[in-house]
Amino acid sequence: MSQQNASSDIELPHLTGLEARIAERIAPTLADLGYELVRLSVLGRDTPTIQIMADRANGSLISVEDCEQISHAAGAILDVDDPIPGAWMLEVSSAGIDRPLTRAKDWERFAGHLAKAELDVPLNGRRRFSGTVMGARDGNAIIRLDDGTEAVLPLVDIRKARLVLTDALIEASAALAGVSSEGEDGGEARQAPKLNPKKPGKK
């Protein structure tokens, strides 16, 4: 579910079409600011919303202020690149504690934690898997199932995968952030959507 940006050696989520083009344009700038792109979606038709989910390069959660910085940087690039005709919205959020696993490095970084995954293409007759993250190798995510067996999931076939919120995950996230985990709820920092109005001459 991840792809390598050859020009900048940045691992991106597996995306296609417009979403891939936008991700490839903004990812290097986000990396320069110390952030990584976790997920990108373009939703809606009349006024599409570009949803950016990001975190820090060390995997720690970002704040509302970080979201604003990312929004400003990405918005400036998209204003020039103009990938979407007409008006569009830009929304930025953190990955959250129970974050999506969209790249090989996510499966490696969160080895030992619980996760759930769903495939586009069935593997041995099943699409849904849950268990302990064991890492990634050769373009596959490895997850140890409840019966002790390991499932090898092709990253490109993963429709969605996410960490399961547990006490251990909360403690690990708090330690990474250098704060107490007391009262942590796994919520995401989110910046209010910004509207990019139609430019003169746009229809």
Swiss-Prot record:
A GO biological-process term: translation
UniProt KW keywords: Cytoplasm, Ribosome biogenesis
Keyword Hydrolase appears in the UniProt entry: no
UniProt subcellular location: Cytoplasm
Region annotation (Disordered) ranges: 179-203
UniProt GO cellular component terms: cytosol
Superkingdom assignment: Bacteria
Disulphides: none
CDD domains given in the database record: YlxS_C
Listed transmembrane segments: none
Keyword Ligase found: no
The family this protein is said to belong to: Belongs to the RimP family.
PANTHER family recorded: RIBOSOME MATURATION FACTOR RIMP
Protein's job: Required for maturation of 30S ribosomal subunits.
Name this protein carries in UniProt: Ribosome maturation factor RimP
Organism this protein belongs to: Gluconobacter oxydans (strain 621H) (Gluconobacter suboxydans)
